[in-house]
Amino acid sequence: MIWLLVAHFTAAALAPALVRKWGRQAFFALALVPASAAIWALPRAPGVIAGEPELFFLPWAPNYQLALAFRMDALSLVMLLLAAGIGALILLYCARYFSDDEPGLGRFAGVLTGFAGAMIGLVLANDLIQLYLYWELTTVFSYLLIGHYPERRDSRRAAAMAINVTTMGGLTMLVGLVILGESAGTYLISGILAEPPSGTAVTVALVLILVGALSKSAIFPFSLWLPAAMQAPTPVSAYLHAAAMVKAGVYLIARLTPAFGDIPAWQYTAVILGTATMIGSGWRALRQHDLKLLLAHGTVSQLGFLTAIFGIGTRDAALAGLAMLCAHALFKAPLFLVVGIIDHSTGTRDLRELSGLRKKMPVVFWTSVVALMSMAGLPPMAGFAAKEAAFGAFEHADTLLATLALAGVVVGTLFTVGYSLRFLWGAFFDKENTSPTPLLHPPGPLFVAPAIVLAALSLLGGFGASLADPVFASYADTVPGAGHDPAHLALWHGLSLPLLLTALCLAGGLLLFRWRVMVAWLGARFALPEAGNVYRRIVYYLSSFATQVTGLTQRGSLPLYLGTILVSLLVVSTAPIVWGRLWTLDVPPVRWIDTPPQLIPAAIIIIAALWTLIVRGRLFAVVLVGMTGYGTATLFALHGAPDLALTQFLVETVSLVVFVLVLRRLPPQFSTPVLRSRRLVNLAIGIGSGILVAVMAYLTLAGRQAESISEGFPAAAEEAGGSNIVSVLLVDVRSWDTMGEISVLAAVAAGVASLLFVRRRTRLPHTHIETGRIVARLPQPPSNGESEWSPLPLTYVGDIITPRVAHKPLWLPGVLTLAQERRSIIFEVVARLMFPVIILISVFLLLTGHSHVGGGFAGGIVAGLGLMVRYLAGGRHELYLSLRLPPGLLIGLGLSITTGTALAGAIFGTEIFAGGAFDLHLPFLEPIHLTSALAFDFGVYVLVIGLIQDILYSLGAGIDEQAEKDSRTGKAPEYESEEVTA
Amino acid sequence: MIPLSLSETTLPTVTTQAPDLDYWLLSPLLVVFAAGVIGVIVEAFVPAQRRYSIQTALAMVAVGVAFVLTLVQVGALPADSAGLTLAFATVVVDRPSLFFQGVILALALASLLLIAERRDGESAFTGQAAAVPGSEEERAHVLAGSQHTEVYPLVMFAVLGMQLFTAANDFLTMFIALEVMSLPLYLLCGLARRRRLFSQEAALKYFLLGAFSSAFFLFGIAMVYGYAGAVEFAAVRAAGSSGGLIDGGEPLLLIGIAMIGVGMLFKVGTVPFHNWKPDVYQGAPTPITALMASGTLVAAFGAMLRVFYVAFGTTVAQWRPMLWVVAILTMVVAAVIAVTQRDIKRLLAYSSVVHAGFILTAVVAANADGLTGAMFYLAAYGFTTVGAFAIVTLVRNPDNGAEAGDLTQWAGLGRTSPFLAASLGLFLLAFAGIPLTSGFIGKFAVFEAAVAAGATPLVVVGVLSSAVTAFFYVRIIVLMFFAEPAENAPRVLKPGILTGTTVGLGVAATLLLGILPGPVLEHVIPQPAAETSEAVAAEHTAADSLFAR
């Protein structure tokens, strides 16, 4: 069986080449492929009907129980013959329908052949996932076929609508299939049918599968796509939308009916929706002018009929359903083909323009009459036999549902008779006020032949109904509850209720035809909303909803993104706290306050933080943020942690200065004012997050099991020869950590500088004082052979300034380069006087760090602040002058000293970082307690100075220089970045 | 250090013995790490014009060697045990980790091909990241043909982080891996050659939000430590079944799970932590986007599976509701938003978000099928997405050579460049989960696992969301094949050998995994040794029997 599929898909792949070579005649060759499938099946039919299905099994993905499993039983056989037989005829028809120069014909031929293959696979598949696979393949192929005229907007739309509706249904069905397979423990359809699982999950699965089936078979509420799909070339309509693809849904229902036909949800859904579709679409068909649309609505109506029949779920219904399915394929396909012939020959298919074709195309006319009689359910056609059986099945089912459904399908059949007559009259008969339609070119024999064959089969089917009965019964008997009086297909059942109903339908149909104008008017007057419009509106609303959601959530605003994350975090973290009553845990008691003065910095912090949210100036905001830092430092101090406080103070100061240096180049105010409401929301989120983190930090204490490590710190500090625990921790107990941290600091310094100095920094800017003038000469960077450009910062040569008062000593020599209005004598004097003091303090902090407040880090920052003061007072050249060592050297030196100390411990002592201590006694001073840790701390000290110098060089002097250059070249300082504040 | 002779009770003993490392088992990590370090040294000492060839060769050889070593190790794993733990049980070598590492290395190699691609000496990266966008200086650099070959060592470090992320066996190692992975990526995101401000903004956003999520991750670790008294996965797992260290401490675990979850879900990019994804994917240089969309996603899910299956494997009931909500939100919101996208990279970003939601359904399943399903899905998605981004790099604006992101420009591409459009069409079909592509098997695998675990509603949502996403994938295919070529039709570059290989790899993987998934499922993806699906409990042990602890 796998070879059938391989043959089809190979033929599909070859089709474009064949069409290129032979033109439309290639369809003859392609028609052989489905024909051979039908021929393959015929000899196997007796065995299959006798109850010995053909099987094929090949594992595909055994881990997921996926397999290439095929099985041909009676139902599959019938479907295969329909799909392959009609497929072959349609391909023949194509050979005359198209012309050689039809654009995209090669692709069309390939896709159509491929579709036939997919359809054959679909009806043979014995694995749920295989079934789904072919199901989706038919969807995709049908999409390509409907969209055959890509240049037509309607064609594209119809194709998109069809694929959207059926894919959605298909995917829903996939869920159902997976649930079904999981509940049954196997994905083999035969296995599931043999031992049907049950339970709520299975019911859900069946409803989901039904959604897929109904969408494929265009049952209400999914009927909209089929009429729209009539944009496709007529052979496609005849094959996909009458004989094959739309039957897939009905096939699936038929396939599962033997196992699940008695489940109420399944029954009610199928019967009610099926009947409703039959009536609704039949009514719509009655007012169509386009013959093809008339047939399309008629097809939807008939599909509803089929669904309703199978939905009844009895053995007789299954028999009638399968018979009706065959009859429908045999009459609807030729009718579509006839429409194609008419369209082709006259150039129109609008029944208001057609007239008098009965005499001009007699063969076509009689073919249509036969097919229409079958459609209307008139004897002696196949349609009659099938419909009689169907009425009988409804009658015998003997439930309220079936009885109501019977009434419904009688109304539907009545409409069917009506629109059959409308078709016949509209296509062929003479009409008043309409001149006979001229034939552009009469249809050739080969063009008409497929329709004749199919119509003839409709006729034969009627007479041979009793011959076909065993085939259909072979399937129908698999439905349980046959009873002792199973129905049989026959042309003549005797005078019974079905026959009576047929007469009623005929009479009603004639009346409808008689009053066709009024019916059309009534239909149009009281039409339900056009399904297509509903679909378009849904799509429109979906996309506008999506746009709104996108606009709301995806506006590119960082605060908004962060807010979303924080809110989610608040929700997911608060829930367990509240739910688990975490506050009932055994946590240490809260100490709200130690001394009243703590309230002052606390209040300052809160006010400053809130104020920060309101201000518009950047600088002010930075100052306010700094105040929260100073407040925290004060709290540290009040809490008895002078080291922390000192470090915090110093760090705050440095950051404040750095901020100010950077803000010089930014607009003074935040660029966009923030909405008050947004600020309030942000405020709430901020407060919420803060409280959450605080609460969690506090509650975590409840989880403490081990003794705190800090219990041992005093002893450790003693051991290390110091009395300042913080300092000892930094430079001794955890010196490895400090090593890591200062390495990071060094890397950060390099990073900050490299952002401004694009090029590798070559040498220290060379500033020195010669007699009478300051020479500030910046070295030329090494010339780069590749480019001729000059990088901005460090190339400017010059700044040779002759001072006005050369012989007077200056407080700060660097100020000579400053403009007069920028100078401040007082500041210069203070800076000059303070500098040695500051350096002295820094050294003091460094030396005493081990036993008192201070340390290398704090000392380094203090020294850095000294540099900072000189820079602020004297400008960048003063900075260059005040410390002649380049920052890179200092940083490297600092790192070397610390590493050296560490290694020295290994060389002279016992291990890395091993150390010693001794007291140095100097005159006039307290004995200085020297330890090897001091050397380590000195490294930190040097490194921190280098870091601050680096920041000043880059963010201070570097930016100054750019600004100077800009002002020289007359360029106004431009703001390079816009801050996102919203 | 001055020896501390304190009593044992007050200070925990610090080991004095160096750990005994099995360098052979660590070799895939070490090779990539070494390549990164050597790359840095190359930057410092090799003349600029020779760096490109050395760096590309170094990076590709390293990734290739690491890949081979990973494969060899799979073969060398003892058949009867799940795997081994190394270096004080901080790193684990088991079948899932080796699988994820192998996939990551393969995807990294594919991305490296894109990264290394140069056209007329132009790579996807800016010549000089520090030059102000639009400045004279930038122009000078462009004219001089400057290039950042630092990209390669950065990528190596990122890949190292990804490898380690899937192999970490305790939360702290995992955190370090997270940072090693993320930091280079933050930087790489800001290096786009064109639309640089955009790229820098993306990098900044990614960095800030990523920093926050890392912080949450750390907070979560602290909470879990408070609950379990340990950060090792095995210990956390044991604590989960014994009820933790303290009475009533379960909320600590819950907060821990939530916060660790937030950290990981951010990396994975699920709603509501997805916001960064479209902006970053769009702004970053496309080869880096490809690396992030494939490698990072695989790594993040690899880690997530390990955390939730092993560490939190005994507390499934506690975290399942959260992941349910996140999965549903992700699949619905991202699918809805994706419909409106007009830019190919943003669309792929949202598609990545939706796919993350699909994979989450497998995590929620918490059974062996979920694990193998997620593995297959990740591998399939990774290759497809790398291929898709490779194609994005080829379609350029005619005037300035930037990538033509606007989808309207892609109209009619099927006529002008049929192979390219067909490849993208295939990738899109795979994203949509159409049968015979890898995407279908992947979706089937995760959905099947979720149904088996009783998460049917999740699967229903997932499938509906697939339908919505299929809508926009199909729309692009329609646009490419059925619409008239656009006025401002893009210039389609002829794929060079590097990009061509990546596209080819994507197509081959998508088709192979779609048509012949059997061999892959059987031989490549680790399977639990004995599937005992008798009881739910038994299933749980089967689920994590794959993981070494």
Curated annotation (Swiss-Prot), chain B:
Q: What is its EC number?
A: 7.1.1.-
What kind of membrane protein is this, topologically? Multi-pass membrane protein
Task: Report the family membership.
Answer: Belongs to the complex I subunit 2 family.
According to the record's subunit comment, the protein's assembly and interactions are: NDH-1 is composed of 14 different subunits. Subunits NuoA, H, J, K, L, M, N constitute the membrane sector of the complex.
Q: Which Pfam families match?
A: Proton_antipo_M
Tell me the classification of the organism that encodes this protein.
Answer: Bacteria, Bacillati, Actinomycetota, Actinomycetes, Streptosporangiales
Its transmembrane ranges are 26-46, 57-77, 96-116, 148-168, 171-191, 206-226, 253-273, 297-317, 321-341, 347-367, 375-395, 421-441, 466-486, 496-516
Q: Name one GO biological process term.
A: ATP synthesis coupled electron transport
Q: What is the name listed in the Swiss-Prot or TrEMBL entry for this protein? A: NADH-quinone oxidoreductase subunit N
Catalyzed chemical reaction(s): a quinone + NADH + 5 H(+)(in) = a quinol + NAD(+) + 4 H(+)(out)
Keywords on this record? Cell membrane, Membrane, NAD, Quinone, Translocase, Transmembrane, Transmembrane helix, Transport
Localization terms from the record:
Cell membrane
The reply on keyword Transport is yes
GO CC terms, sorted: plasma membrane
Q: What does the UniProt record say this protein does?
A: NDH-1 shuttles electrons from NADH, via FMN and iron-sulfur (Fe-S) centers, to quinones in the respiratory chain. The immediate electron acceptor for the enzyme in this species is believed to be a menaquinone. Couples the redox reaction to proton translocation (for every two electrons transferred, four hydrogen ions are translocated across the cytoplasmic membrane), and thus conserves the redox energy in a proton gradient.
Molecular-function GO terms, alphabetical:
NADH dehydrogenase (ubiquinone) activity; NADH:ubiquinone reductase (non-electrogenic) activity; quinone binding
